[in-house]
């Protein structure tokens, strides 16, 4: 069973967690994926390892790590892949995929142009 784990950075600002949860809720409803969780790289909980554990406990055999990050950087290029690799070792029967940062999506140009109208 496919699961999506929406991964955000995390922040000490309380509204950040609410925004991530709201985004997850909207995506879950529109995607119709039954296992759709969220996690944070740091500061907030659940952390990425806990989010992966939750997905596996709910029956995931495949987890798509959906990056709520705009560009590449240390977290996207090093930290998150390292955490996912640790999860691969822990759950060898689970398939993992990490998406590209949102900013690499070709639709971002149109979105930005719409925002500045």
Task: List each language-model region with its residue ranges.
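Active-site-proximal alpha-helix that buttresses catalytic centers in soluble enzyme cores
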Residues: 1-117
């Amino acid at each position: 069973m496919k699961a999506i784990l929406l991964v955000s950075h995390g922040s000490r600002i309380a509204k950040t967690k609410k925004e991530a949860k709201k985004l997850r809720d909207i995506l879950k409803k529109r995607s119709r994926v039954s296992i759709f969780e969220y996690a944070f790289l740091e500061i907030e909980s659940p952390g990425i390892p806990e989010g992966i554990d939750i997905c596996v406990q709910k029956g995931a055999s495949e987890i798509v790590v959906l990056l709520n990050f705009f560009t590449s950087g240390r977290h996207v290029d090093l930290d998150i892949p390292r955490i996912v690799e640790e999860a691969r070792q822990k759950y060898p029967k689970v398939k993992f995929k990490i998406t590209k940062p949102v900013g690499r999506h070709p639709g971002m140009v149109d979105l930005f142009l719409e925002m500045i109208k």
